[in-house]
């Protein structure tokens, strides 16, 4: 039996407030009809452009790093089709002393570039380029008030997706690829127009879909971290009552040699939550908790507890 208990300072909790979504009948999520055809080998095109600018489609490439000085940096390149096309980059930078910088900047369509064969995303002089093994990420200080990044992310863990990485309910879907579950970060960071060398550990994933997230999920809880040589991802997504009200849990444990254990869906994996979060979210928000426990029927147990809120943002306020 492997038991992993993680007491951490960050836990990503995301929730969708109760919104009126109209009277449309939605197709239920069916656990037996989830895509599982791609096999275990993940190819570079899976981190390339996956959407076609159809209405309601969205896609983002996400990166976060915990630097050796204790700082946390987050970068995400978004594209959304909502009647018209929207393109933006978001950055967050938090230092141990409480100093914080965050900004979202929009770009014109003519200033963007994407490739389908691999991850090559460029917004003006900012880019997110890689091949599942090595990535170059650049944030131009001229676009972000003197804050910038020019770094390399080198994967130490192979990419992962549960089955095909797609959660679908009829024709509606949300997809996730952990392109770099863990990696080494090296490069330069600019803050207040002063450049320093940085190093640390980092993570990159890629998400896309064709319907608003709040029309698929009530809420979700997600974690990524390390214990010794192990890289761990744990999560639970909860579909809306209109989609059947299903819980979709998952667990991933790997080291440099490969996957040690992974499980996804409702096949012998169980979750419980503790420590209701109060005083942080709106009253009509779904109940969210700061502790997640995941237990599998083959005796893997993961316990995650968040002890500090670093950032609290409304996901759909852009």
Residue ranges, per PLM feature:
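Structured soluble/peripheral alpha/beta segments that form catalytic or ligand/cofactor-binding pockets
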Residues: 18-318
